């Protein structure tokens, strides 16, 4: 007989055993995995493993090689990494080649700052010396950002990234430009562009952001000019315009009206101001706006008659500055414009084609007719690149006493242009009224200073030129947008509206660091089309980079025998958006490990006007379609109160800080649980919420690892599995479909939420809780225990592989703990799910079982709260079920085991008054009762067969049998 007084029953249980730590220690542990992956060259191993699989390519939108990464970079790269890893684990060769955008103004600024600090003048430094320093600056930040991305567990070909400053890349970018030139899409023109005086360069739409500022606003009188028929009383009257940019008045060349607006001729009857209209003056306004305008000027008026659009189209006006500076003696025509409304202003639009896109278009639409009427159609250049008026603004430019007035100075501050123009309008008695207005105004996204529209000679790509096949760049792009998948779908509408309304693409910048517009032009601006010249350029760029264009003797070198023909070398550089828009050429097309087009582009929502946009135009212009099949966008990260992060507010959250304090997997979990396509929030409390969620997840993984330490790999045939195990396998089938669908549709939050809920609700609080007794206490030969181990094994393998793309550090740690000889979890595939596991009938049955169980557990929770029981094993409740379908669902089940009680009774009798119920489970009531029998010293269950085996008098018959089996195996 065994001396039971010497048995430590806890040592006879199959309790979880694992060295997988409860405390993650991610900040210390994660770098060890980064090192391991690098030493084993995991990325290369995955490429070799997957070389015969279909390619899946996410083309990396290049971040700018300037500064440490911020939270937006982290969000972006984590999303990309999850996509590439998930496709890799689903049977694809999912390559990820990181890239960097290296040219452009921000880097130039940094080098110029260094020069200024050293007392050097950039203009005195040879251009290629300056470009060399820009290249070194970018290279340094690429190295820094590479390490920061690796620390986030971003897996990619960091040994062979792409950069826009690579010599081959520069050659390909130049080659793409030459394609536009050869097809006639590239032209040199004069158009108003957004110009940064501070940065001395034109800006693309993607480089502009809007902020509220306060501006002068003025109403200006344009007198009706010329011979007007005697019966037309418009003679001697004036048309009034309104503008918030007084400095553009010298550039005025027309006044626009709308044939859809009703106008009237009005006479001033009373005036309170010392300046402006006097009684008796006759003025033309939109009927809808006259009262508001005259109130601003403190005027009383009366309406004389209606003025038709036909009348307006026949008259011309005098310039309000006529007689000043000797340069405003021309007439100002009236133009019918679709852009004119009567929502604000006067119903007339001051039209300065040098200073506005709509003004320019209205002028150019009428250029032929204007010339036929003897009006000069040429557009002036009233403001220079430094913000000063030029000779095209007589009286305000170099001929002005004291020098030219200035619109904006080098620091982005307002100059004196508005002041001097308003003063002259007052002197000429052409100012109707004045005021101040707070409104949204464009600013450079780099300098944060206001920009201006100014007419400049620039290089453009036509949006609406026939490309020889009946299409235009615009029509091609719009067609392709309809053929592209967008996530979220609103991105399609957004990009379409931008393409529909955009002007011709401005390609040129007046800077030094970038790929040059490598063309030669004659005196008329015609581009030299010579294949031999172009080949010399391309060959030189391939070997020496674009610096070759700026080297001494470059003109003669490239032109060769044509050097004496008078061709001029263009010195402008390409807009960096053309660089990044061309990345598909030297990555997707040129790298054997990639393919064209990419399966997906993923960037922030601002890239509808940025990289998505420029890539679409570049590719449609040269290849007729987009370089991507799908576009995924994410929002921006705000603080936890929904405010924009800024250093001045002290509310920034850096990825470096989160990683240092909590670990990269915490940051990745946050990304996975956000609605990333919208703006997200991040702060201390949100990070803590994710830490708490991670701990629960980690503890579930840890419990499985500890439990599986006793797994000997035995399998039970599916038909012999208990219902509970078959239910769990069914749930794995459902989750497998959800996970695969979620990764396909980039709906990561859906996956994360489903898996976390499954682990917390269905595993920890249900399946694992129920099966702990069998797993810990059953005999080694128990089919129930073997089935449970087999099921936990299947759950572990699937959960860890499903979560590996999201939490690569933690899942690698767990996988290697379970399979220490494995290469990596990231070399695994999602396991296929046997068709027999799906059992919808069983799932419906267990939906009912769990509903009844909820009522039981609810009743027992009250018993515990009132301290009538300490554990559910002390209970043997009576369950009253009036719904036969619910009672039928319990047939064949050990419902006490499922409710984790020592006993349970089911009755179809009427429930006694006071029985516990739940409102959402009809027809079920529970009366708690204490369990009968004695407490088993090993399993702690109360049974009536404790001591049935005299050799083990302290335990139940089940536990005694288990102890005998352990004894026979020499484990007791």
Swiss-Prot record:
Which InterPro entries does the entry mention?
aa-tRNA-synth_I_CS, aa-tRNA-synth_Ia, Anticodon_Ile_BEm, Ile-tRNA-ligase, Ile-tRNA-ligase_type1, Ile-tRNA_ligase, M/V/L/I-tRNA-synth_anticd-bd, Rossmann-like_a/b/a_fold
Which reactions does this protein catalyse?
tRNA(Ile) + L-isoleucine + ATP = L-isoleucyl-tRNA(Ile) + AMP + diphosphate
As annotated in the record, motif 'KMSKS' region runs over: 644-648
| Entry keyword Ligase | yes
Which cell locations does it reside in?
Cytoplasm
Q: TM segments?
A: none
Residues forming the motif 'HIGH' region are 63-73
Q: What class of enzyme is it?
A: ligase
- GO cellular component labels: cytosol
Q: What is its main location?
A: cytoplasm
Question: Mind listing the UniProt keywords for this protein, alphabetically?
Answer: Aminoacyl-tRNA synthetase, ATP-binding, Cytoplasm, Ligase, Nucleotide-binding, Protein biosynthesis
Binding site residues for L-isoleucyl-5'-AMP? 603
GO BP term, pick one: isoleucyl-tRNA aminoacylation
What positions does the entry give for ATP binding?
Answer: 647
> What terms describe the molecular function in GO for this protein?
aminoacyl-tRNA deacylase activity; ATP binding; isoleucine-tRNA ligase activity; tRNA binding
UniProt entry tagged with the keyword NAD: no
EC number(s) for this protein? Answer: 6.1.1.5
Known function:
Catalyzes the attachment of isoleucine to tRNA(Ile). As IleRS can inadvertently accommodate and process structurally similar amino acids such as valine, to avoid such errors it has two additional distinct tRNA(Ile)-dependent editing activities. One activity is designated as 'pretransfer' editing and involves the hydrolysis of activated Val-AMP. The other activity is designated 'posttransfer' editing and involves deacylation of mischarged Val-tRNA(Ile).
Q: Which NCBIfam families match?
A: ileS
Indicate the quaternary assembly.
Monomer.
Q: Which family does it belong to?
A: Belongs to the class-I aminoacyl-tRNA synthetase family. IleS type 1 subfamily.
Task: Please provide the record's free-text comment about the domains of this protein.
Answer: IleRS has two distinct active sites: one for aminoacylation and one for editing. The misactivated valine is translocated from the active site to the editing site, which sterically excludes the correctly activated isoleucine. The single editing site contains two valyl binding pockets, one specific for each substrate (Val-AMP or Val-tRNA(Ile)).
**Protein name (database record):** Isoleucine--tRNA ligase
Identify the species of origin: Brucella melitensis biotype 1 (strain ATCC 23456 / CCUG 17765 / NCTC 10094 / 16M)
What broad taxonomic lineage does this protein's source fall under?
Bacteria, Pseudomonadati, Pseudomonadota, Alphaproteobacteria, Hyphomicrobiales
